[in-house]
C-alpha cells in the first residue's frame, strides 16, 4: 500500500540536529546577555483572543488584514496564533498586576506566526526574541536597550556588519498633524500608488511609508518628513536620545521615513539593518509605545522594547561564516568495542562530567568496529576520542587520540583521565 507522506506546512520549517546546537548557542547568548542586564523571563500563550491584536497592532496593517492565523475554537470564539510578542506580554502584565506601581524589565523567546509569502529570512512560523521595559520614562531606558542590542552583536561576532537607524514618531497630536500633510502629498501622486497604499491612504497613511514596494521608494524618500513637524518636547526627547548614543559611542543614522509596522509606537523608533541579507535587511526593530498599556485597559504606563528574529540572525551568521565559531565547545567521544567496555565507558563518562562540567561527553553505546566508531567520532565534531578496546580494558588503560591534530595516540591509566584532561584542554 502506498501512503502519501505528510510534510511540514509551507513556510514552517524543521530545525534538524546539525543546526540545533547553533540555535541553542544563539538563544543562550541572548539569555545570558539579558540576565547580565537584570532582565527577567516571562512566558505567555502562543494563542490569544483575536481582539488583542486588532486593538494593538492596528486593523489597517498587513499583519491584521492579511497575515494572521485566525480561526474559531469549539466555543465559537475568534482566536489567533500570535504574530508578535509585545501585545501578549503587555496583556499578561496587566492581567496579573505586574504594573501596579512597579517597573518591569522582561524578555521572552518563542515562535510567532504570520501568513506571509515564504522566502529566505521570512517564514510563516518564525522564532522571535523580545525585550520589553515597562514603567520607565526618559531616554535612559531607550539607550539601555540599544546598548543591549550592541552587546548581543558583539557577543555573536557581527557588530561591524549591522547599522543602527533611528527616527522619532512624536506625540499622537503631532502624528495627526503630519498625517494631513502626508495625505495631501500622496494624493498629488495618487496615480503612482499601488492598491495597498491607496487603501491605506485615508485610514492609515503612515503605513504607506512602510511599503516595501520598490516602485514606491523614490516617492517615499521625497515625502514630507514627520520630524519637521515635531513640537519642542518631542524634539528635545529625540535630541537627548541621539546625544546619548554619541556619548555611548554607538554610531547611528537618522532615517526620516522609518516608521514601525505596528500602530502602537510613538516617539523613539529604531532598527538595526545589514547589507548582507539582500531585501531582508532588518534584523532587529523596536521603539517606545507609551499608549499601549492604556489601549489594553491598564493605567497609562511608559514602555519601550525591541524584537529580533532568530532565523535572520542565523542567516546573517551563516553569511559571515560565523556558525563554526559559535559551535566550538570542547567535546569528547568515547569509543567502546564490547559490552564490558561500554559499561566502563559509561562509568568514565560520568566521572568526566563530574570533574569537567563544561565538557560535552558522547558515549557510543552501540558498539561496532573501530573504523565505524572513529567515523562517528569525527562526525560528532569531538576534539578527543577516548578508546576502550579489549587491550585497554585488560590493562585498565584508556587510549587517547586527538582528532584535530597529528599528535600521536597515547595511553594512560584510567584513573588519570581527569588529570590528563585538565592539563590537555586547558
UniProtKB/Swiss-Prot annotation:
The keyword Aminoacyl-tRNA synthetase applies. It comes from the Bacteria. It catalyses: tRNA(His) + L-histidine + ATP = L-histidyl-tRNA(His) + AMP + diphosphate + H(+). Keywords: Aminoacyl-tRNA synthetase, ATP-binding, Cytoplasm, Ligase, Nucleotide-binding, Protein biosynthesis. GO terms for biological process: histidyl-tRNA aminoacylation. GO terms for cellular component: cytoplasm. It is found in: Cytoplasm. Pfam families: HGTP_anticodon, tRNA-synt_His. PANTHER family: HISTIDINE--TRNA LIGASE, MITOCHONDRIAL-RELATED, HISTIDYL-TRNA SYNTHETASE. Homodimer. This is Histidine--tRNA ligase. It comes from Legionella pneumophila subsp. pneumophila (strain Philadelphia 1 / ATCC 33152 / DSM 7513). The lineage of its organism: Bacteria, Pseudomonadati, Pseudomonadota, Gammaproteobacteria, Legionellales.
Amino acid at each position: 500500500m502506498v501512503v502519501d507522506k505528510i510534510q511540514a506546512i509551507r513556510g514552517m520549517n524543521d530545525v534538524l540536529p546539525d543546526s540545533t546546537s547553533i540555535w541553542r548557542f544563539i538563544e543562550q547568548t541572548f539569555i545570558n546577555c539579558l540576565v547580565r542586564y537584570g532582565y527577567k523571563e516571562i512566558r505567555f500563550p502562543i494563542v490569544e483572543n483575536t481582539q488583542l491584536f486588532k486593538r494593538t497592532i492596528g486593523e489597517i496593517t498587513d499583519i491584521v488584514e492579511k497575515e494572521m492565523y485566525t480561526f474559531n475554537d469549539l466555543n465559537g470564539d475568534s482566536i489567533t496564533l500570535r504574530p508578535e510578542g509585545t501585545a501578549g506580554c503587555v496583556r499578561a502584565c496587566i492581567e496579573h498586576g505586574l504594573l501596579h506601581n512597579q517597573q518591569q524589565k522582561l524578555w521572552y523567546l518563542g515562535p510567532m506566526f504570520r501568513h506571509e509569502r515564504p522566502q529566505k529570512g521570512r517564514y510563516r512560523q518564525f522564532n522571535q526574541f523580545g525585550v520589553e521595559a515597562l514603567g520607565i520614562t526618559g531616554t535612559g531606558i531607550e539607550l539601555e536597550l540599544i546598548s543591549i542590542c550592541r552587546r548581543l552583536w558583539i557577543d555573536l561576532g557581527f557588530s561591524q556588519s549591522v547599522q543602527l537607524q533611528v527616527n522619532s514618531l512624536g506625540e499622537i497630536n503631532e502624528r495627526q498633524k503630519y498625517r494631513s500633510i502626508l495625505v495631501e502629498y500622496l494624493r498629488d501622486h495618487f496615480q503612482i500608488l499601488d492598491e495597498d497604499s491607496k487603501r491605506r491612504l485615508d485610514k492609515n497613511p503612515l503605513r504607506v511609508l512602510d511599503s516595501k514596494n520598490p516602485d514606491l521608494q523614490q516617492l517615499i524618500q521625497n515625502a514630507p518628513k514627520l520630524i519637521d513637524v515635531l513640537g519642542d518636547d518631542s524634539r528635545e526627547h529625540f535630541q537627548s536620545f541621539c546625544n546619548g548614543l554619541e556619548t555611548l559611542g554607538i554610531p547611528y543614522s537618522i532615517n526620516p521615513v522609518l516608521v514601525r509596522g505596528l500602530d502602537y509606537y510613538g516617539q523613539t523608533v529604531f532598527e538595526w539593518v545589514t547589507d548582507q541579507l539582500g531585501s531582508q535587511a532588518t534584523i532587529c526593530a523596536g521603539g517606545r509605545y507609551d499608549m499601549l498599556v492604556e489601549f489594553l485597559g491598564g493605567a497609562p504606563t511608559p514602555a519601550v522594547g525591541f524584537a529580533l528574529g532568530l532565523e535572520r540572525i542565523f542567516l546573517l551568521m551563516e553569511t559571515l561564516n560565523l556558525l563554526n565559531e559559535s559551535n566550538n565547545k570542547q567535546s569528547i567521544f568515547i569509543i567502546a568495542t564490547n559490552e564490558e567496555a561500554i559499561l566502563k565507558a559509561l562509568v568514565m563518562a560520568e566521572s568526566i562530567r563530574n570533574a569537567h562540567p563544561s565538557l560535552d561527553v558522547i558515549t557510543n553505546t552501540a558498539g561496532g568496529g573501530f573504523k565505524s566508531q572513529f567515523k562517528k567520532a569525527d562526525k560528532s565534531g569531538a576534539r578527543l576520542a577516548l578508546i576502550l578496546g579489549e587491550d585497554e580494558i585488560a590493562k585498565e588503560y584508556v587510549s587517547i587520540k586527538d582528532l584535530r591534530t597529528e599528535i600521536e595516540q597515547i595511553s594512560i591509566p584510567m584513573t588519570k583521565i581527569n588529570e590528563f584532561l585538565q592539563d590537555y584542554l586547558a
